[in-house]
Regions:
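Extended terminal accessory/targeting regions
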Residues: 1-121
Length: 121
């Protein structure tokens, strides 16, 4: 998906697939805490299938993500961790925000599409 313009309404996210069994378990085991910083217990390797191709997201054990960024006041609507699908959205957004191939704008467009198509927002 590098160097492609992702259009807010044209991008579709069809699903995700964990490449290793430990990634799903690792994300499911994360427990919310007051610091809102979550080190992953193992590698997470997953594929995000979109209308623009497939994005492979791989993290190392110990990768730190913060769930949904932003103030606690909106946790009632968009939880800091939430469902597995929401956690995947937050994780992929954090991974792309740390020097991956997508621009900041495209990273946010992918997040919005994932929330719409995977998490039901």
């Amino acid at each position: 998906m590098k160097n492609r313009q992702l259009y807010k309404y044209g991008l579709k996210v069809y699903g995700f697939e964990f490449i290793n069994g430990k990634g799903r378990e690792c994300l499911e085991k994360v427990v919310q805490n007051d610091t809102r910083r979550y080190p992953l217990c193992d590698e997470v390797n997953l594929l995000i299938r979109t209308s623009y191709g497939t994005l492979n997201v791989v993290t190392a054990p110990g990768f730190m993500f913060d769930g949904r960024s932003g103030p606690k006041i909106v946790d009632w609507y968009a939880p800091n961790l939430g469902t597995l699908e929401e956690r995947i959205c937050w994780l992929v957004h954090d991974c792309n925000g740390y020097g991956q191939d997508l621009s900041f704008e495209d990273t946010n467009l992918l997040l919005f599409a994932m929330l719409r198509d995977l998490a039901g927002y």
